[in-house]
Design a protein with these regions (language model features):
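Catalytic phosphate/metal-binding cores of nucleic-acid and nucleotide-processing enzymes, i.e., regions
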Residues: 10-11, 40, 68
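Glycine-rich phosphate-binding "P-loop"
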Residues: 12-25, 66
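Short, acidic loop-to-helix structural element flanking the phosphoryl-transfer center
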Residues: 27-44, 78-79
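C-terminal cap/substrate-recognition subdomain and adjoining C-terminal extension
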Residues: 55-155
């Protein structure tokens, strides 16, 4: 996805990195519609889920979904998530999260989107993001209609 935002650098997104709990899932259960959306956009983007897997449900919930799951250990999760984004090539990453441990990946990625859903969002994550949405499904709306980003981020 290439998008030119007036007054900012051009975005060239090929990787989408999601946090799991509070972002793709609520209380460990995948939010309805997420699997279908990831599979729909998989020919255009490489999807990644990086998580501490608080509820131990991520592998089963994402079985059959076109994404790579990366479970990180406890301790310095924010640094682990940032490093993952950097390894992918941060200039090609859209990162999505809601937690305090997501703040560095949201800040590092070419585009960071914070979500405020049922589990809420850490203020640090919201402040680190370029965009804030009310639903993970809104993120897929940006993938389908990139000009929404232009309207939101133009200077």
């Amino acid at each position: 996805m290439q998008v030119t935002i007036p007054g900012q650098a051009e975005l060239d997104i090929s990787h989408v990195v999601f946090d799991y709990n509070g972002t793709l899932a609520e209380d460990g259960a995948l939010i309805p519609g997420v699997a279908q959306q990831i599979n729909h956009f998989a020919p255009q983007f490489t999807f990644h889920v990086i998580t501490a897997d608080t509820y131990g449900t991520v592998a089963q919930a994402l079985e059959g979904v076109a994404c790579t799951v990366h479970v990180i250990p406890n301790g310095q999760q924010d640094v682990s998530k940032r490093q993952y984004v950097e390894q992918l090539g941060k200039e090609h990453v859209l990162a999505v999260g809601n937690g305090n441990n997501d703040k560095l990946m949201l800040q590092t990625a070419a585009l960071g989107i914070a979500l405020i859903q049922a589990e809420g969002a850490a203020v640090q994550a919201v402040m680190a993001a370029a965009v804030v949405c009310a639903s993970v499904l809104d993120v897929f709306g940006y993938l389908a209609t990139p000009n929404r980003l232009v309207a939101t981020l133009r200077n």
